Amino acid sequence: MMNPLIIKLGGVLLDSEEALERLFTALVNYRESHQRPLIIVHGGGCVVDELMKQLNLPVKKKNGLRVTPADQIDIITGALAGTANKTLLAWAKKHHIASVGLYLGDGDSVKVTQLDEELGHVGLAQPGSPKLINTLLEGGFLPVVSSIGVTEEGQLMNVNADQAATALAATLGADLILLSDVSGILDGKGQRIAEMTAAKAEQLIDQGIITDGMIVKVNAALDAARTLGRPVDIASWRHAEQLPALFNGTPIGTRILA
């Protein structure tokens, strides 16, 4: 079996039918012409935000990470492992792709510990066991994995989806693409940066060009490139016609170098 490709989905993608249609059409085309196994890892911040708004609950972030109090983890689990995950499975079904919905704790695929007490139920993901997901891939299934994990003590944790995808890529020896709303990392003039090293990222963070959630994304990608020992791509789902090329290894966004 070829080494798998993990596609991490994020941003408002889950809110846009047009975007999901484009993405799944690209996935179908890619799967028809390549034997390479694919895995989707997703967050769903927009789904969570919408739910929190309906429930009149505050959304608090610290350094770009969502603070998850004990009384909110059940709601966030429902939004990510429930609504967001099943929405993606429904789209896969519509496109005749045999898929299976999972969370990080299934088959101990990704191990999770609490990241920081101040953040509450927010987890740090580390590589786990490849057994379950490899079994599914060998059976021709598309695993769709939410970024909810569980600690050894049985505590549910909300994990940053970029970081969850990195840990799963390390578990499986997979390549990783981080798909988001932006077409890559932009410089101070709004131009896409084709390649990024750790030194360059540090410089842009110091200059205030990379800020907030993008710092988390860039650090996750740098961490992924270092952990995996290979480049990681940050790209946009908006250019559907370019996605098959991206899945084939052609950079269309920003390539993060190890």
UniProtKB/Swiss-Prot annotation:
Disulfide bonds: none
Keywords: Amino-acid biosynthesis, Arginine biosynthesis, ATP-binding, Cytoplasm, Kinase, Nucleotide-binding, Transferase
Gene3D superfamilies assigned to the protein according to its UniProt record, in alphabetical order: Acetylglutamate kinase-like
Residues the entry annotates as binding substrate: G44, G45, R66, N158
Primary localization: cytoplasm
Localization annotation: Cytoplasm
Binding site for ATP: D181, V182, S183, G184, I185, L186, I209, I210, T211
EC annotation from Swiss-Prot or TrEMBL: 2.7.2.8
Broad class of enzyme this protein falls into: transferase
UniProt pathway: Amino-acid biosynthesis; L-arginine biosynthesis; N(2)-acetyl-L-ornithine from L-glutamate: step 2/4
Site (Transition state stabilizer): K8, K217
GO BP field: arginine biosynthetic process via ornithine; L-arginine biosynthetic process
Claim: Amino-acid biosynthesis is one of the keywords in the record: yes
GO molecular function terms noted in the UniProt entry: acetylglutamate kinase activity; ATP binding
Gene Ontology CC, one term: cytoplasm
Catalysed reactions, as listed in the record: N-acetyl-L-glutamate + ATP = N-acetyl-L-glutamyl 5-phosphate + ADP
Role summary: Catalyzes the ATP-dependent phosphorylation of N-acetyl-L-glutamate.
Matches recorded under PANTHER family: N-ACETYLGLUTAMATE SYNTHASE, N-ACETYLGLUTAMATE SYNTHASE, MITOCHONDRIAL
Similarity-based family: Belongs to the acetylglutamate kinase family. ArgB subfamily.
Self-association and partners: Homodimer.
Designated name of the protein: Acetylglutamate kinase
Gene name linked to the record: argB
